[in-house]
Protein backbone atom coordinates (compact mmCIF):
# COMPACT_ATOMS: atom_id res chain seq x y z
CA UNK A 1 0.00 0.00 0.00
CA UNK A 2 1.36 3.42 -0.99
CA UNK A 3 -0.30 6.65 0.09
CA UNK A 4 0.56 9.85 -1.75
CA UNK A 5 -0.16 12.80 0.59
CA UNK A 6 -0.99 15.74 -1.68
CA UNK A 7 -1.06 19.50 -1.10
CA UNK A 8 -4.02 21.07 0.70
CA UNK A 9 -6.82 22.42 -1.47
CA UNK A 10 -10.37 23.57 -0.74
CA UNK A 11 -11.41 23.32 -4.40
CA UNK A 12 -14.37 21.13 -5.36
CA UNK A 13 -12.32 18.61 -7.35
CA UNK A 14 -10.76 17.35 -4.11
CA UNK A 15 -13.92 15.44 -3.14
CA UNK A 16 -13.80 13.47 -6.40
CA UNK A 17 -10.07 12.73 -6.44
CA UNK A 18 -9.42 12.08 -2.73
CA UNK A 19 -8.58 8.37 -2.23
CA UNK A 20 -8.50 7.70 -5.96
CA UNK A 21 -6.66 4.46 -6.62
CA UNK A 22 -3.71 4.07 -8.97
CA UNK A 23 -2.33 0.64 -9.93
CA UNK A 24 1.45 0.35 -9.93
CA UNK A 25 1.73 -3.27 -11.00
CA UNK A 26 1.76 -6.49 -9.04
CA UNK A 27 -0.14 -6.17 -5.79
CA UNK A 28 0.98 -2.60 -5.11
CA UNK A 29 -1.69 0.08 -5.04
CA UNK A 30 -1.26 3.83 -4.63
CA UNK A 31 -3.93 6.14 -3.22
CA UNK A 32 -4.08 9.92 -3.43
CA UNK A 33 -4.81 11.41 -0.01
CA UNK A 34 -5.81 15.06 -0.43
CA UNK A 35 -6.22 17.42 2.55
CA UNK A 36 -9.19 19.78 2.41
CA UNK A 37 -12.11 21.32 4.28
CA UNK A 38 -14.99 18.99 3.44
CA UNK A 39 -16.07 15.72 5.02
CA UNK A 40 -15.21 13.90 1.78
CA UNK A 41 -11.65 15.31 1.68
CA UNK A 42 -8.60 14.23 3.65
CA UNK A 43 -9.20 16.98 6.22
CA UNK A 44 -6.55 19.06 7.99
CA UNK A 45 -3.98 18.32 10.68
CA UNK A 46 -5.51 18.79 14.12
CA UNK A 47 -2.55 18.04 16.34
CA UNK A 48 -3.34 17.76 20.03
CA UNK A 49 -0.36 19.93 21.03
CA UNK A 50 -1.75 22.91 19.14
CA UNK A 51 -5.27 22.51 20.53
CA UNK A 52 -3.85 22.17 24.06
CA UNK A 53 -1.69 25.27 23.50
CA UNK A 54 -4.73 27.20 22.27
CA UNK A 55 -6.71 26.33 25.41
CA UNK A 56 -3.77 27.07 27.69
CA UNK A 57 -3.31 30.57 26.26
CA UNK A 58 -7.00 31.38 26.46
CA UNK A 59 -7.20 30.16 30.07
CA UNK A 60 -4.08 32.12 31.11
CA UNK A 61 -4.45 35.28 29.03
CA UNK A 62 -2.86 37.68 31.53
CA UNK A 63 0.25 35.52 31.81
CA UNK A 64 0.73 35.35 28.05
CA UNK A 65 0.16 39.06 27.60
CA UNK A 66 3.17 39.60 29.85
CA UNK A 67 5.18 36.98 27.95
CA UNK A 68 4.75 39.10 24.83
CA UNK A 69 5.51 42.33 26.73
CA UNK A 70 1.96 43.63 26.38
CA UNK A 71 1.67 45.64 29.57
CA UNK A 72 -1.11 48.07 28.62
CA UNK A 73 -4.81 47.47 28.13
CA UNK A 74 -6.05 47.54 24.53
CA UNK A 75 -9.53 47.34 23.06
CA UNK A 76 -8.23 45.27 20.18
CA UNK A 77 -5.02 43.28 19.65
CA UNK A 78 -4.32 42.30 16.04
CA UNK A 79 -1.51 40.18 14.62
CA UNK A 80 -0.45 40.94 11.03
CA UNK A 81 1.51 38.50 8.86
CA UNK A 82 1.28 39.43 5.18
CA UNK A 83 2.89 39.54 1.79
CA UNK A 84 3.44 42.93 0.14
CA UNK A 85 0.26 45.01 0.15
CA UNK A 86 -1.20 48.42 0.87
CA UNK A 87 -2.76 48.96 4.31
CA UNK A 88 -4.17 52.49 3.83
CA UNK A 89 -7.83 51.52 4.16
CA UNK A 90 -7.10 49.08 6.94
CA UNK A 91 -5.61 51.81 9.13
CA UNK A 92 -8.30 54.33 8.18
CA UNK A 93 -10.95 51.85 9.29
CA UNK A 94 -9.16 51.26 12.59
CA UNK A 95 -8.99 55.03 13.11
CA UNK A 96 -12.75 55.34 12.69
CA UNK A 97 -13.33 52.70 15.36
CA UNK A 98 -11.94 55.19 17.88
CA UNK A 99 -10.48 52.35 19.92
CA UNK A 100 -7.09 51.69 21.43
CA UNK A 101 -5.52 49.17 19.05
CA UNK A 102 -2.27 47.21 19.17
CA UNK A 103 -0.83 45.87 15.92
CA UNK A 104 1.74 43.09 16.23
CA UNK A 105 3.74 42.95 12.99
CA UNK A 106 5.47 39.71 12.04
CA UNK A 107 8.24 39.30 9.47
CA UNK A 108 10.31 41.93 7.71
CA UNK A 109 8.02 41.97 4.67
CA UNK A 110 4.99 42.75 6.83
CA UNK A 111 6.84 45.43 8.76
CA UNK A 112 7.94 47.18 5.55
CA UNK A 113 4.26 47.50 4.59
CA UNK A 114 3.71 49.71 7.65
CA UNK A 115 6.86 51.86 7.76
CA UNK A 116 5.28 54.90 6.09
CA UNK A 117 2.37 55.07 8.53
CA UNK A 118 4.04 55.27 11.92
CA UNK A 119 6.15 57.93 13.60
CA UNK A 120 9.26 57.29 15.69
CA UNK A 121 7.09 56.28 18.64
CA UNK A 122 5.28 53.68 16.53
CA UNK A 123 1.93 55.43 16.92
CA UNK A 124 -0.71 56.27 14.33
CA UNK A 125 -3.47 58.09 16.17
CA UNK A 126 -4.70 55.57 18.80
CA UNK A 127 -3.05 52.70 16.97
CA UNK A 128 0.27 51.36 18.21
CA UNK A 129 2.46 49.09 16.09
CA UNK A 130 5.10 46.74 17.47
CA UNK A 131 7.61 44.93 15.27
CA UNK A 132 8.06 41.41 16.57
CA UNK A 133 11.31 39.47 16.15
CA UNK A 134 11.47 36.06 14.54
CA UNK A 135 10.43 33.31 16.94
CA UNK A 136 9.48 29.64 16.90
CA UNK A 137 6.26 28.39 15.36
CA UNK A 138 5.05 27.24 18.78
CA UNK A 139 5.34 30.80 20.02
CA UNK A 140 3.59 32.09 16.90
CA UNK A 141 0.69 29.77 17.67
CA UNK A 142 0.55 31.21 21.18
CA UNK A 143 0.43 34.71 19.71
CA UNK A 144 -2.43 33.80 17.37
CA UNK A 145 -4.38 32.35 20.29
CA UNK A 146 -3.75 35.52 22.30
CA UNK A 147 -4.88 38.07 19.68
CA UNK A 148 -8.45 39.20 19.07
CA UNK A 149 -7.99 39.28 15.29
CA UNK A 150 -5.39 37.59 13.10
CA UNK A 151 -4.31 38.61 9.61
CA UNK A 152 -2.45 35.57 8.31
CA UNK A 153 -0.65 34.50 5.16
CA UNK A 154 0.18 31.14 3.60
CA UNK A 155 -1.47 27.83 4.38
CA UNK A 156 -0.01 26.82 7.75
CA UNK A 157 -1.05 29.97 9.58
CA UNK A 158 -4.35 29.96 7.66
CA UNK A 159 -5.25 26.52 9.03
CA UNK A 160 -4.24 27.62 12.53
CA UNK A 161 -6.46 30.68 12.22
CA UNK A 162 -9.38 28.46 11.24
CA UNK A 163 -8.85 26.26 14.29
CA UNK A 164 -8.75 29.19 16.71
CA UNK A 165 -12.33 30.24 16.02
CA UNK A 166 -11.39 33.93 15.98
CA UNK A 167 -11.96 36.63 13.35
CA UNK A 168 -9.21 36.46 10.71
CA UNK A 169 -8.33 37.42 7.16
CA UNK A 170 -6.19 35.29 4.86
CA UNK A 171 -3.62 36.80 2.51
CA UNK A 172 -3.23 33.98 0.01
CA UNK A 173 0.05 33.71 -1.92
CA UNK A 174 -0.31 35.77 -5.14
CA UNK A 175 -0.11 33.82 -8.41
CA UNK A 176 -0.15 34.72 -12.09
CA UNK A 177 -3.49 35.25 -13.84
CA UNK A 178 -5.25 35.53 -10.45
CA UNK A 179 -5.15 31.77 -9.92
CA UNK A 180 -4.93 32.43 -6.19
CA UNK A 181 -8.28 34.26 -6.24
CA UNK A 182 -9.95 31.18 -7.72
CA UNK A 183 -8.50 29.13 -4.85
CA UNK A 184 -9.63 31.74 -2.35
CA UNK A 185 -13.17 31.74 -3.75
CA UNK A 186 -13.27 27.94 -3.43
CA UNK A 187 -12.45 28.27 0.25
CA UNK A 188 -15.04 31.01 0.76
CA UNK A 189 -17.77 28.86 -0.79
CA UNK A 190 -17.18 26.32 1.97
CA UNK A 191 -16.48 28.78 4.75
CA UNK A 192 -19.07 31.55 4.35
CA UNK A 193 -21.22 30.85 1.30
CA UNK A 194 -24.20 32.81 2.63
CA UNK A 195 -22.30 35.83 3.93
CA UNK A 196 -21.71 38.07 0.93
CA UNK A 197 -20.07 40.88 2.94
CA UNK A 198 -17.52 38.60 4.57
CA UNK A 199 -16.69 36.91 1.26
CA UNK A 200 -16.14 40.30 -0.37
CA UNK A 201 -13.90 41.40 2.52
CA UNK A 202 -11.61 38.40 1.99
CA UNK A 203 -11.44 38.88 -1.77
CA UNK A 204 -10.90 42.64 -1.58
CA UNK A 205 -8.16 42.14 1.01
CA UNK A 206 -6.30 40.10 -1.62
CA UNK A 207 -6.73 42.52 -4.53
CA UNK A 208 -5.94 45.76 -2.68
CA UNK A 209 -9.51 47.03 -2.86
CA UNK A 210 -9.85 46.78 0.89
CA UNK A 211 -13.10 47.65 2.60
CA UNK A 212 -13.05 46.63 6.25
CA UNK A 213 -16.14 48.36 7.61
CA UNK A 214 -18.31 45.23 7.74
CA UNK A 215 -15.51 43.13 9.23
CA UNK A 216 -14.74 45.37 12.21
CA UNK A 217 -18.37 46.31 12.87
CA UNK A 218 -19.31 42.64 13.14
CA UNK A 219 -16.38 41.07 15.00
CA UNK A 220 -18.59 39.45 17.63
CA UNK A 221 -20.84 37.88 15.01
CA UNK A 222 -17.83 36.68 12.99
CA UNK A 223 -16.20 35.24 16.11
CA UNK A 224 -19.34 33.26 16.97
CA UNK A 225 -19.56 31.94 13.41
CA UNK A 226 -15.86 31.02 13.35
CA UNK A 227 -16.18 29.14 16.64
CA UNK A 228 -18.95 27.04 15.09
CA UNK A 229 -16.89 26.47 11.93
CA UNK A 230 -13.92 25.45 14.08
CA UNK A 231 -16.12 22.88 15.86
CA UNK A 232 -17.22 21.54 12.47
CA UNK A 233 -13.60 21.10 11.35
CA UNK A 234 -12.59 19.34 14.56
CA UNK A 235 -15.59 17.02 14.31
CA UNK A 236 -15.41 16.20 10.59
CA UNK A 237 -11.99 17.07 9.15
CA UNK A 238 -9.33 15.40 11.30
CA UNK A 239 -6.66 14.31 8.82
CA UNK A 240 -4.90 11.90 11.19
CA UNK A 241 -8.13 10.12 12.10
CA UNK A 242 -9.13 9.89 8.45
CA UNK A 243 -5.73 8.49 7.49
CA UNK A 244 -5.73 5.88 10.27
CA UNK A 245 -9.28 4.81 9.46
CA UNK A 246 -8.39 4.41 5.79
CA UNK A 247 -5.30 2.32 6.51
CA UNK A 248 -7.21 0.09 8.92
Indicate where each model-derived feature is located.
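Catalytic donor nucleotide-activated moiety binding site of glycosyltransferases and closely related
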Residues: 98-133
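Short, aromatic/basic amphipathic alpha-helical patches
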Residues: 15-23, 93-94, 114-123, 183-185
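Active-site donor-nucleotide binding/catalytic segment of nucleotide-sugar enzymes
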Residues: 36-112
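Hydrophobic/aromatic beta-strand patches that form the interior of the parallel beta-sheet core
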Residues: 1-5, 32-35, 104, 130, ...
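A donor-sugar binding/catalytic signature common to diverse glycosyltransferases
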Residues: 134-183
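Active-site-proximal region of nucleotide-activated glycan assembly enzymes
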Residues: 1-63
Amino acid sequence: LMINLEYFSSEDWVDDFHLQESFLGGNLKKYFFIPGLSEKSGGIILDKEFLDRKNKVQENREYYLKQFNINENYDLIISVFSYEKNFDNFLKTLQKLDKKVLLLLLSEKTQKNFIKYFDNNNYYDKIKAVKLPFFTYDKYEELLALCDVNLVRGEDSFVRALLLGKPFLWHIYPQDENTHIIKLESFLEKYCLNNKELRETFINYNINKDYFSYFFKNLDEIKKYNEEYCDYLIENCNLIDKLINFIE
